[in-house]
């Protein structure tokens, strides 16, 4: 598989371990690089979203965007943290974002996305210690894929 080929179809469900065998990336993070750093993987877990109150804003929006809360379970999230910064810089670096929904060890591919022109906003949500903190909410737009004949 070349670095430009994406082997997974929208709607396809597979084990997360198998996904990482195919394209690389970290097995446990919500945001990770893959394909030797040429793309990003983002995993949304509805159970985690509900636990931390992210479900109030996460997911598909009426305007077609997908909102995703950044990485970091304790204290204020920062856009300068490693994973959040990588996601924020993905558009400038030409890295596609491949979005998945997690359920247990299964992941379902939602599609290829990019950061919106208005890439993020701040919200308040509890951390894992039930203390309110600032979280970054990324705004993702479905990417148009150019086909070469």
Feature map (PLM): residue ranges:
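Compact mixed alphabeta submodule
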Residues: 103-149
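Acidic, glycine-rich low-complexity segments with interspersed aromatic residues
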Residues: 2-108
């Amino acid at each position: 598989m070349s670095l430009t080929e994406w082997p997974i179809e929208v709607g396809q469900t597979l084990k997360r371990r198998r996904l990482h065998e195919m394209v690389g990336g970290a097995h446990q993070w919500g945001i990770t690089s893959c394909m030797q750093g040429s793309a990003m993987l983002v995993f949304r877990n509805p159970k985690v979203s509900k636990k931390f109150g992210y479900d109030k804003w996460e997911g598909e929006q009426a305007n077609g965007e997908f909102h995703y809360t950044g990485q970091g379970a304790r204290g204020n999230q920062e856009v300068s943290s490693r994973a959040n910064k990588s996601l924020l810089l993905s558009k400038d670096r030409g890295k596609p974002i491949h979005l998945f929904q997690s359920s247990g060890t299964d992941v379902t591919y939602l599609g290829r996305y990019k950061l919106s022109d208005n890439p993020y906003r701040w919200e308040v949500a509890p951390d894992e210690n039930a203390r309110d903190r600032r979280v970054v909410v990324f705004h993702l737009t479905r990417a148009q894929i150019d086909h070469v004949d």
